């Protein structure tokens, strides 16, 4: 029988009715009681329109109060919230709407109804629906085995797959994070990442489970994030590597307030040089490792280890397990990362064959490559699918990228494999520069730090690198 708890938002509204739940950049805020009432109101409106338990309701929106309320409305209805990426083309969105079996798509006003393959409602249209309390009974309890949300993987390999996330997955993710980072009375978590991304969504849910206010930005902007940390009493922020780079540059010779205690870094390995810069400026960067399939981070450094184990993602969170395929007793040997725990997805929606391939005795094959050191700390090397095999040698793009960004004036770097008749594949690089840099300068630096077979055979200067909505580098789009 599935484990149950009182509905999280109902419970939080009872425990902390007048406490701020969400703050926005325009200065407005919502209490937990207000969030409870508004979410239940949307649930009754959806019920009036005929949506019921088990229905899939797609949401396409930038970060805003309505999006948060409708996600919680789905939980009161017993519906599954399908969270879609606003950067996708209409064709990609329609593919996911059909694949997810969504009954409706709810959007902000900027998306036109005529473009979608199914019924579309914007926030104003849903708001205008009258409530009817007699039609449905809203959920008072949460069943951990029930699917709460679905979000699509970024699709770096083939057609994106919908990851099913249960209430239990989200609960264990939130409580495990609290056991690692701790909870402080003054905590306020900044969300500059999209709520349709697992990092943004998981922090939104932590707010209700912890009773901790969140500060929500519509999108990442350096100045707004900087000001929030400096002036809005933010103590924790979730970031990816490119955000850290830009925030360090914006900070200059200043320092963050003493209450700012954690910059939680996800989205892939970060250059060691960047982490050293952060350490010099006393910026508390905690590397982590996680994915949509693990409902946010599953491996994180502790506050005690953040400055001692630079470059490591840490150890598995309390209820989680991790191993390296075929290398369980061999430290420092690179292999595929496997994870297991109550925050790991049940599987991909309508992908029975894929689920058989990626799950082995409840261990999830992540497709990421890494190794454990002698103390059991994880070091993530790269995506297995980004691996470049050149003349039989394994080349990891992130290693080359890390060396390139050590050159003063190279702000960002991306590396991918390119077909080559002699070697099969060779690395080529794309860089974003803040000053003119000669080929000789780059070549001299690479020669010092990389074996010859790892050095890029081509280097292209570009204005920007392709990134997804979470600002993660999309290597297969380099050069397109």
Curated annotation (Swiss-Prot):
InterPro entries in alphabetical order: AMP-bd_C, AMP-bd_C_sf, AMP-binding_CS, AMP-dep_synth/lig_dom, ANL_N_sf, MenE
GO BP terms: menaquinone biosynthetic process
Reaction(s) the record says it catalyses: 2-succinylbenzoate + ATP + CoA = 2-succinylbenzoyl-CoA + AMP + diphosphate
GO molecular function: ATP binding; o-succinylbenzoate-CoA ligase activity
Disulfide bonds, paired cysteine numbers: none
Protein's UniProt keywords contain Nucleotide-binding: yes
Keywords tagged on the record: ATP-binding, Ligase, Menaquinone biosynthesis, Nucleotide-binding
CDD domains listed in its UniProt record: OSB_CoA_lg
Pathway(s) per entry: Quinol/quinone metabolism; 1,4-dihydroxy-2-naphthoate biosynthesis; 1,4-dihydroxy-2-naphthoate from chorismate: step 5/7; Quinol/quinone metabolism; menaquinone biosynthesis
NCBIfam families to which the protein is assigned, alphabetical: menE, PRK03640.1
Function: Converts 2-succinylbenzoate (OSB) to 2-succinylbenzoyl-CoA (OSB-CoA).
Recorded family membership: Belongs to the ATP-dependent AMP-binding enzyme family. MenE subfamily.
PANTHER family membership: AMP-BINDING DOMAIN-CONTAINING PROTEIN-RELATED, LONG-CHAIN-FATTY-ACID--COA LIGASE
The protein's name in its UniProt record: 2-succinylbenzoate--CoA ligase
Organism classification: Bacteria, Bacillati, Bacillota, Bacilli, Bacillales
């Amino acid at each position: 029988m599935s484990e149950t708890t009182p509905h999280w938002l109902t419970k939080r509204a009872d425990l902390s009715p007048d406490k701020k739940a969400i703050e926005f950049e325009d200065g407005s805020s919502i209490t937990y009681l207000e969030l409870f009432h508004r979410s239940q109101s949307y649930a009754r409106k959806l019920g009036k329109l005929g949506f019921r338990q088990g229905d899939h309701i797609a949401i396409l929106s930038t970060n805003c109060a309505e999006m948060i309320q409708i996600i919680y409305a789905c939980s009161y209805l017993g519906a599954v919230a399908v969270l879609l990426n606003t950067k996708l083309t209409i064709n990609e969105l329609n593919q996911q709407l059909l694949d997810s079996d969504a009954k409706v798509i709810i959007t902000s006003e900027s998306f036109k109804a005529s473009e979608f393959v199914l019924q579309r409602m914007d926030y104003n249209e849903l708001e205008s629906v009258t409530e009817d309390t007699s039609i449905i009974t809203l959920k008072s309890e949460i069943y951990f085995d029930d699917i709460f949300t679905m979000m699509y993987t970024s699709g770096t390999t083939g057609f994106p797959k919908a990851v099913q996330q249960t209430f239990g997955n989200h609960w264990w993710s939130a409580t495990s994070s609290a056991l690692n980072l701790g909870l402080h009375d003054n905590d306020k978590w900044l969300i500059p990442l999209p709520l349709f991304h697992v990092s943004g969504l998981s922090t939104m849910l932590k707010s209700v489970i912890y009773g901790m206010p969140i500060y929500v930005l519509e999108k990442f902007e350096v100045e707004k994030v900087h000001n929030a940390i400096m002036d809005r009493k933010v103590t924790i922020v979730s970031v990816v590597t490119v955000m850290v780079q830009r925030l360090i540059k914006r900070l200059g010779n200043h320092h963050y307030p003493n209450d700012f205690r954690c910059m939680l870094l996800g989205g892939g390995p970060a250059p060691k040089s960047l982490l050293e810069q952060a350490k010099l400026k006393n910026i508390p960067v905690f590397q982590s490792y996680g994915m949509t399939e693990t409902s946010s981070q599953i491996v994180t450094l502790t506050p005690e280890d953040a400055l001692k184990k630079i470059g490591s993602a840490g150890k598995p969170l309390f209820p989680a397990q991790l191993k390296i395929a075929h290398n369980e007793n061999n430290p420092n040997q690179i292999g595929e990362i496997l994870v297991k725990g109550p925050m790991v997805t049940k599987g991909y929606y309508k992908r029975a064959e894929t689920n058989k391939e990626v799950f082995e005795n409840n261990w999830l094959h992540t497709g990421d490559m890494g190794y454990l050191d002698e103390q059991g700390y994880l070091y993530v090397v790269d995506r297995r699918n980004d691996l470049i095999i050149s003349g039989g040698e394994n080349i990891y793009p992130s290693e080359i990228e890390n060396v390139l960004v050590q050159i003063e004036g190279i702000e960002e770097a991306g590396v991918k494999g390119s077909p080559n008749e002699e070697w099969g594949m060779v690395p080529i690089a794309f860089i974003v520069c803040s000053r003119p840099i000669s080929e000789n300068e780059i070549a001299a630096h690479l020669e010092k730090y990389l074996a010859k077979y790892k050095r890029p055979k081509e280097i292209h200067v570009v204005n920007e690198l392709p990134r997804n909505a979470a600002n993660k580098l999309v290597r297969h789009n380099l050069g397109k």
